[in-house]
């Protein structure tokens, strides 16, 4: 059922994270098969990121990946999660967005961010201290180009001279800006009326920033004549479920410790764990993840609703924690047993079921009476004909 916090739709967010000792080609096609699976299950969105180093996050161009995914899927929205704007000329980003918008017939969502990996920035000769400033400059140009403006702008890292898009977008392209702990993301979202992609929503520090971030977005939106909608606010967190907590914990022995210890080397305040059991205990207890049952997942979403005041999408932060079979089953359980608590499906059905079960068999008695009456009429008609 939905409640005062409104409807929540579900999707998936992939960096993607794959073990560096696995085959890259297999992993890439595994992710394409996953988006097909999620499309069949009715998930609303699938997001994929851009990275260039580390050996784990192996997709360099989410645009190219989503062009392939668009041909394999029918309904699911395809989110670029995210394009690292300081790495690209903003005109070329806008031009590629238009092409992908046409290829997907309007199913693409543009996610923007400053770039995460320090080694990515190092190889490109970019000072990470400047990344957020460059993201803001690029996002402004992309926003204006997609709106049909002609842009002339010169900065210390790009030039646009009478730049315009010679092909119009297929749709009114949705935009979302990443938010973790700093106010940069919600500030940009408010300025341009864009969505927010909260990638640290379950982090103990990030979760306490959620309400503050939304207020920043609303305040900045009001100052700029824009509006922001909670339906376009996406929160993300790790979630792997099975029929029992014991089974879920067994499932993630496949790769959780390996990948989370990788993350400890690129994420501030994230400590490495000595073993998988202490890792699971720690991230479950901190609310950072749900490794457990659908009931535990429902509790997590409700906690995030309380902390944030309400949001429109929850993206399952997915990595190669478990085998392919276990991962697909986890998404099936989320679709069957978690999503209905938040997408409006459960309330009417439970009302109908409870009404029937509390009727003291009145419906069965009415049906039986109608059947007996029909039998009497039939017998009476036959008696008249034989006489």
Swiss-Prot record:
Molecular function via GO: limonene 1,2-monooxygenase activity
Cofactor: FAD
S-S bonds: none
Annotated source species: Rhodococcus erythropolis
This protein's UniProt keywords: FAD, Flavoprotein, Monooxygenase, NAD, NADP, Oxidoreductase
First-tier enzyme category under EC: oxidoreductase
Cellular component, GO, one term: cytosol
Keyword Protein biosynthesis part of the UniProt annotation: no
Purpose: Acts on both enantiomers of limonene by their NAD-dependent epoxidation at the 1,2 double bond forming limonene-1,2-epoxide.
Keyword NADP: yes
Lineage, top ranks: Bacteria, Bacillati, Actinomycetota, Actinomycetes, Mycobacteriales
Pathway, per record: Terpene metabolism; (4R)-limonene degradation; (1S,4R)-1-hydroxylimonen-2-one from (4R)-limonene: step 1/3
Pfam family, one: Bac_luciferase
Catalytic activity: (4S)-limonene + NADPH + O2 + H(+) = limonene 1,2-epoxide + NADP(+) + H2O; (4S)-limonene + NADH + O2 + H(+) = limonene 1,2-epoxide + NAD(+) + H2O; (4R)-limonene + NADH + O2 + H(+) = limonene 1,2-epoxide + NAD(+) + H2O; (4R)-limonene + NADPH + O2 + H(+) = limonene 1,2-epoxide + NADP(+) + H2O
Gene (name only): limB
InterPro entries: Bact_Lucif_Oxidored, Luciferase-like_dom, Luciferase-like_sf
Family: Belongs to the bacterial luciferase oxidoreductase family.
Record-given protein name: Limonene 1,2-monooxygenase
EC number: 1.14.13.107
């Amino acid at each position: 059922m939905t409640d005062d916090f409104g409807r929540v739709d579900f999707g998936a967010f992939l960096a993607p994270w794959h073990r560096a000792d696995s085959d890259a080609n297999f992993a890439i096609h595994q992710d394409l098969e996953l988006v097909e699976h999620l499309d069949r299950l009715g998930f609303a969105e699938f997001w994929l990121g851009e990275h260039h180093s580390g050996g784990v996050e192996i997709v360099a161009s989410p645009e190219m990946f989503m062009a392939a995914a668009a041909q394999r899927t029918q309904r699911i929205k395809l989110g670029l999660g995210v394009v690292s704007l300081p790495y690209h000329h903003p005109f070329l980003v806008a031009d590629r967005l238009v092409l992908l918008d046409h290829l997907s017939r309007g199913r693409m969502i543009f996610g923007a961010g400053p770039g995460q990996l320090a080694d990515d920035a190092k190889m490109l000769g970019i000072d990470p201290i400047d990344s957020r400033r460059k993201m803001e400059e690029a996002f402004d140009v992309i926003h204006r180009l997609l709106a049909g403006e002609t842009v002339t702008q010169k900065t210390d890292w790009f030039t646009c001279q009478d730049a315009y898009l010679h092909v119009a977008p297929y749709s009114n392209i949705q935009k979302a800006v990443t938010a973790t702990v700093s106010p940069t993301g919600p500030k940009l979202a408010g300025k341009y009326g864009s969505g927010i992609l909260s990638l640290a929503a379950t982090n103990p520090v990030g979760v306490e920033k959620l309400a503050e971030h939304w207020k920043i977005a609303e305040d900045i939106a009001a100052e700029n004549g824009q509006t922001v909608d909670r339906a376009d606010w996406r929160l993300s967190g790790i979630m792997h479920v099975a029929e029992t907590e014991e089974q879920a914990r067994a499932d993630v022995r496949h790769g959780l410790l390996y990948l989370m210890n990788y993350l400890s080397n690129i994420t501030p305040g994230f400590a490495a764990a000595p073993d998988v059991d202490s890792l699971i205990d720690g991230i479950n207890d901190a609310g950072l993840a749900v490794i457990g049952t659908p009931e535990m997942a429902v509790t997590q979403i409700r906690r995030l609703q309380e902390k944030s005041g309400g949001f429109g999408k929850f993206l399952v932060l997915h990595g190669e924690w478990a085998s392919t079979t276990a991962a697909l089953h986890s998404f099936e359980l989320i679709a069957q047993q978690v999503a209905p608590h938040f997408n409006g499906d459960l309330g009417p059905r439970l009302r109908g079921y409870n009404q029937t079960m509390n009727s003291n068999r009145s419906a069965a008695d009415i049906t039986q009476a109608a059947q007996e009456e029909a039998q009497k009429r039939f017998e009476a008609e036959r008696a008249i004909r034989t006489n």
